[in-house]
């Protein structure tokens, strides 16, 4: 055999061995991928420390507003009513199937994030705007936007003010620790109009100061102005100016470092929205769970168990939430709808299919 023939024989043998090795490796990789996929499908997410602690104590601790109609305000029996209060109750239903297993902690704007970071509360549903600096500097996470708003001003009708530019030299009530402080200062500076801020710790204090004439205007998010006005003795004496000066996307806030708890609160919120998108209501949830052939509806209502398994919740968790509290639109209408004192049109808080900004990511 010549040297060239020996080289051809050797190289061909080596090539065949290498090809066999590569084929074996590819087969092993495919088997590992399939095994991992099967494991992920069959293994529900482990509960994080926050969910474990909530289950151990037997109730959710939820941070809410100190008092503003529409979001969180005690009724005549001392029970908290409002969208944020109901969203807290919904988390309790998702975990315990019991809307009463929640303790509300009323927090001012200046103390809310400290209370969450220290572990005093498990979650904030408290008219809290997502901003870049809050996201990157506080050690907290914004779960998902559930309400879209903007900064506005409310004045007494007889003040003769129709736009913010008319408010030169005005004294303006603001809430300490909110985005509204900076928004107001930035806007008045941009139009070269001087003003005097007066800061208060709570919304009810600022409202009282406005009604007593210690301020010419009250500046905060328009939805909260509508709530404040609805609680005044003579709401018709007050005007909320039409101009809006900021984007104020509200969402639940949670501590960083517990991804499982973040996922639960995030996808719970989307489920409430998804229920409205699919037409599932308090009244028809039971029937739709029993009769719907829509795969998305069956997943949402727990006929098939994968959504509950992935969050380590009962398969019927979202069904229980909607059956107890309603879908997003029902919750909104209960606290802001035309039959309420607040009477705030949905505007950007309509579903995306109706020209709004609200939609759920796919629950699948």
Task: Locate the predicted segments by residue.
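Extracytoplasmic small-molecule ligand-binding "clamshell" domains
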Residues: 48-125, 328, 351, 355
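Bacterial N-terminal signal peptides that target proteins for export
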Residues: 7-8, 15-32
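Bilobed "Venus flytrap"/periplasmic-binding protein-like clamshell domains
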Residues: 59-70, 80-95, 129-130, 149-201, ...
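Extended ligand-binding regions for polar small-molecule ligands
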Residues: 86-95, 157-161, 165, 170-171, ...
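Bacterial N-terminal signal peptides
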Residues: 29-41
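Acidic, polar ligand-binding/catalytic clefts
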Residues: 89, 93, 97-166, 223-246, ...
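C-terminal functional modules
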Residues: 310-364
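Sec/Tat signal peptide C-region and signal peptidase I cleavage site
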Residues: 42-47
